[in-house]
Amino acid sequence: MEKILRGKVIIKGIIHTLTGLYIGGSKETMEIGAIDSPVLRDAVTGEPYIPGSSLKGKMRALLERTIAGKDPNFKIDRNIGTGRNVVKIHVCDTKEQAAKCEVCRVFGSSGSKEGTNFPSRIRIRDAYFEPYTKKKLEAAETDFLFSEVKYENAIDRITAAANPRQIERVPAGSDFGFEIIYDVEEIADLSTDVENIAMLLQLIEDDYIGGNGSRGYGKVLFYLNYCVAKKIDAYKELTGSKYEKVVLQCEKEIKDETDYKDLCTIDTLKGKIAEVTKFFKEG
């Protein structure tokens, strides 16, 4: 089966952290005697960031669990982990199955045999600090540049001995700019797929991003400032042509962390899905 690209839906906004955020980096980049769990940082700027793969993986996992709760035949049985670290996901065996699966057609499927891969329809960019957040943290007296250290104790349930540890995290109140691009391949799937994307962002708001979520880390809110639907012919024309439609846009320039309150919520995006679908159906 051939995958036809009919256009793209681009969603941009801000990830606002309500609690400290931990997405782990390599300990090899830290000096001897440093903290136990460092955050992931950009190799050039040293800024912590949220990898697109982390957000995509979280969204996929939540959608799998959502569908599994409704469909007893939906299996989450493909192990992509290594050694004793078992990580199971749902993967359709064929392209035909993947094209009908709400998980695999959006997030991709590797199939079970050569030639059965179904590439993802979604692209999620790495999320970096908003300029005002970077400026604020550069001036803040934190433990490290752009981050803080949280001290925790793990208690041995038998001996009651304490095992102290240090976890680096991005402070609460930090804002990251994010971007999600959805490839429009089948117009019949468009409404369901974008509805699922919006639903998953709301689920994450009541869940967490990164590690240590059960201990309060990674609570976030999503605010949107832009959404555009672009037919494939829009890439041949000047910006603002009849082949693209901006369905959501924040007119106010975001200069500090108070301005995000003027942005749109995920519910606003949900209210625009019918408009996006109609735009692509018009041909």
Residue ranges and their predicted role:
Residues M1-G283:
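RNA-binding basic/glycine-rich loop and surface signature characteristic of RAMP-family CRISPR effectors
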